[in-house]
Regions:
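Active-site microenvironment for binding and transforming phosphate-containing groups
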Residues: 1-317
C-alpha cells in the first residue's frame, strides 16, 4: 500500500492552520487532524492529464471533459491514496446522507451513471470501514470532512449555498451519531477551499433564503454590496451550523482558501465556465490487527436497527 510522502509544510496565515503539501506530482492539501489513523485531504488542479479549462487534475465526469482523461485522473488519485477506487456521491445539492457499507464502497468511481445508481441525490457520505476513500467533488461549494477519532468513523459533505441552507452538515452529524454513536464534541472538522465571502455575491431572493434559514443571525452572514445584492459568507454559515450542533470551535479547521481568487491551484465555477472539479477525501486506515471485510458486507452491526441503513441513503429528518 502506498503512503503519502510529505515534502513540505506551509503556514496559511488567514486561517492560522498549517497546510501540508504532499507529492509534487499530485499535490494534496492535508487537514491538521490527518494522521496514521485517517487521511483527510483536498486535491488541487495539478497532477492530472486533462487540458484546457480542465487542466489538469479534473475529477468531475459531468463538466465536459473527456471521459478517458477523467478516468486517468481518478486512477492517479486513487493510487496516491493507496486505494483501488474512489467512492463518489451523486451530488444534487441535497441534505441526503449515505451510509457507505461494503456493497457501496468504491461506487461512483466509474462515472456519473455509477454515482447516480449508487448514491442517487446524495451529497454526504459516512462510513466506519477502513480503506474507503469517501470523495466529494467541488468548484466553489465547500467540501467538508468529518472525523470521529473515538468511534473511528469519517464522513464527507458537499455544502454549497443550497445544501448548507438545507442543512447537509447538521444532517451528516446526526447521521454519524445515529449510525456510529459519534458525539459532536469528538468530531474533527475540515472545511476545504471554497468561494470566499468577498467573492460570493448573491441576489435578493437568495439573501432572503439565507435569512429564512438563519434568522437574525443571517444578517452577520450577508454584506450588502449594491441595491438588491449582497455577499454571502459560506464558510461562516457552516461554522455557525457546527457550533449549533455542539461541535467545539477548536475542532473546526478551515483552510480559508478562496477558490474564486485561487484559480492557479483550484477550480472555480464562478471564475470560469466550463471548469473542472477538485476533491476532498476522507479515508480511514486499517488497524494493524484488522482484517479486510468480505465483499458486500458491512460493519454496521452494533444495533439491529442500524442494519436497515446499509446501502440506503439517510434522508433529512
Amino acid at each position: 500500500m502506498s503512503h503519502l510522502h510529505i515534502l513540505s509544510q506551509q503556514h496559511h496565515a488567514s486561517s492560522g492552520i498549517r497546510v501540508r503539501v504532499v507529492s509534487p506530482d499530485l499535490p494534496l492539501r492535508v487537514f491538521p487532524f490527518a494522521s496514521d489513523q485517517v487521511t483527510a485531504v483536498v486535491t488541487t488542479r495539478h497532477g492530472g492529464v486533462s487540458t484546457g479549462p480542465y487542466g489538469s487534475l479534473n475529477l468531475g465526469g459531468h463538466v465536459g471533459d473527456g471521459p478517458e482523461a477523467v478516468a486517468e485522473n481518478r486512477r492517479r488519485l486513487a493510487a496516491a491514496l493507496g486505494v483501488d477506487r474512489l467512492t463518489i456521491a451523486d451530488q444534487k445539492h441535497t441534505a441526503t446522507v449515505a451510509v457507505v457499507d461494503g456493497a457501496l464502497a468504491g461506487r461512483g468511481h466509474d462515472g456519473v451513471a455509477d454515482s447516480a445508481a449508487a448514491f442517487p441525490g446524495t451529497d454526504a457520505m459516512i462510513t466506519d470501514l477502513p480503506d474507503v476513500a469517501l470523495t466529494i467533488l467541488v468548484a466553489d461549494c465547500a467540501p467538508v470532512v468529518l472525523y470521529d477519532p473515538v468511534r473511528r468513523a469519517a464522513g464527507v459533505a458537499h455544502s454549497g449555498r443550497v445544501g448548507t441552507l438545507k442543512g447537509v452538515i447538521p444532517q451528516t452529524i446526526k447521521a454519524m451519531a445515529a449510525t456510529f454513536g459519534s458525539a459532536p464534541a469528538d468530531l474533527l472538522i475540515g472545511i476545504g477551499p471554497a468561494i470566499g465571502a468577498a467573492s460570493y455575491e448573491i441576489g435578493a431572493a437568495e439573501a432572503a433564503e439565507v435569512m429564512a434559514a438563519f434568522g437574525e443571525a443571517g444578517t452577520r452572514l450577508l454584506t450588502p454590496t449594491r441595491p438588491g445584492r449582497a455577499t454571502f459568507d459560506l464558510a461562516a454559515a457552516i461554522r455557525r451550523q457546527l457550533a449549533a450542533a455542539a461541535v467545539p470551535a477548536g475542532n473546526v479547521h478551515d483552510m480559508a482558501i478562496d477558490t474564486r481568487t485561487g484559480t492557479d491551484d483550484f477550480f472555480s465555477d464562478r471564475a470560469a465556465r466550463p471548469c473542472g472539479r477538485f476533491a476532498a477525501i476522507a479515508r480511514l486506515h486499517r488497524a494493524a490487527d484488522e482484517s479486510p471485510p468480505r465483499a458486500g458486507t458491512s460493519v454496521l452491526t452494533r444495533s439491529p436497527a442500524l442494519t436497515l441503513l446499509k446501502s440506503k441513503p439517510l434522508r433529512p429528518a
